[in-house]
């Protein structure tokens, strides 16, 4: 049975977006493995506390990710 793990910084994605991720990631797995795998495909969303995520040797707070996300959307 497929297991998909997704790690996100807490506070960047809302519940609706996380549900959409689960649906679309499951759909992607089913596209590869076949429809019979849908019922046994697990998708786990883990949220890492803001600031406990690091990149380039520095902690990355949710606010920094949201600012970048909003800049791309503009």
What does each model-found stretch correspond to?
Residues 2-74:
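A domain-level signal for the structural core that forms small-molecule/cofactor-binding pockets
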